[in-house]
Amino acid sequence: PFHIGHLASTVIGHSLKMIHAFSGYNCVGINHLGDWGTQFGKQILAYKLWGDKETVERGGVDELVRLYVKFHAEAENDDSLNTRAREEFTKLEHGDEENTALWRWFVKISLDECNRTYDKLGITFDSYAGESFYTDKMPEQVEKLKESGLLKVDNGASIVDLSEYNMPPCLILKSDGSTLYPTRDIAAAVYRDRTYHFDKCIYVTASQQCLHFAQWFKVVELMGYDFYDKLVHVPYGMVSIDGAKLATRTGNVILIRDLIDAAVEKVAAVIDEKNPDLENREQVAQDVGVGAIVFHYLLNSRIKDTNFIMDDALSFDGSTGPYAQYTYARTCSLIEKAGDIKNANVTITEPSEAALMKTLSRFEEVVDAALRDYEPSTITRYIIDVCVSFNRFYQDCKILGAENDDVRASRVSLVKATNTVLANALPLICMKTPKKI
C-alpha cells in the first residue's frame, strides 16, 4: 500500500525532477515499481492459504495488506511458511501459470491504488518500468559478470567479492538461482543508459540502502560500464510514527490516502468558516490539504530521520504549506486589485522593502544550491523566507494606498516580483498555486 514511508521517495524524487527541469535538464521520471521479489512469494502463499477472490476484489489493497500481515504473524511461529513462500516465488520466476496470473492481479490492484494517490498528489511519471520489467535483461549481465571473472560461488550463492573496497560481497544470485536486488538494479541501469543516454541517473531511497547502492555501483564500475560515475544515490532518513518504525509486514502504517483525506477535510472546514463563498472550494481544499503534507515533509533536510506526528503535519501555524500558499494568494489578490500599473523604478523607502528585494534576489542561487546538493528543503526554507519578508513588507507598507503613484507603482512591482518567485518556487516542491484561498 502507499503509506507515508513511500511519500518521502515520491515527493523528494518529484521535487528533484522539477528542480532539474527548471535548471534546463531533460528529465525522465521513473517509478521503479517493487513488483518482483520474495515478498510476492509471501503474498501468493498467504492468498492460497487464507484468501479468496471475492474478498480481495471487494477489499482491494487493504485485503492484500491484511493477508501479508497475517503471513508474517504466522511465520513468527512457523518458519516453514518462509520456505514455502520462497518456493512460490521460485515458481513465479520460472513462469508458473497460476502464480504469474496471481502476481499480475496483485500488481494491478496495488498500482491502481497508488495511481489514485499520485493523482491527488499531482505527481506523474514517464515510466512505470519496475523490477519485473528487467527479468529478461538480467541473464546478459550475469553472463558478463561470469565472463569477466568477477562472479564467484560462495556457499552456493553467486557473489562479487568487494573486500578490496572495504565492502561485503555483493550477492548476485541465490543458491537456488533466483535473483536479488543488485541483479535487477544492474540490469535496469544498463537498460536506462542504452535507452536514455543519461547525464545523471538519480536514485532516491532510504538511507538504510546506502551500502546496497555503494556495492552495485562498484560492481557496475568493475564491469567496465563507463556510466558508473553518472549514478547518484540520494538517501533520506528513516520515517517513523510516534517513534515506531514503519513496516507493512506488521501493519504499522498510515496510508497516504487517509492522511490526504484528513488534511483536505480540515482545510475544507477552515474554508467553510472563513470564506464559505470561495469559488472551487473543493479543489482549493485539495490543493492546500495536499500542500500541507508535502511541505511538512520537505521542510527539513532529507537525510534527517522524521518522526511523523499527524497533528504537526496538519497544523496551519508557523512554517507550513498553507501559510506559503496563502501568501501567494495574497499577492494575486493585490495584483488584481492594483489593475494596470505603469512600469516603475523600485523606490526604497522602508527597511522591509529592501529586505524583501534582497530575499527575492537570492532565488537563482537557492535553486543552484538545491540542484547541487539534491536538497528540496533548500527551496522549502527559502519559500518561508520569502513569505516572512513579504508579509513583513505587507504590514509595514501601504501598497495600494501608498502616498503617491510612484511609490504605489514601486510597491506593486515588488508584489509582482514576489508573485513571480513564489509561482516558480512552489511547483519545485510539488506545491500547487491557488490564486484564491
Which role does the model predict for each range below?
Residues 1-437:
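Non-catalytic interaction-recognition regions
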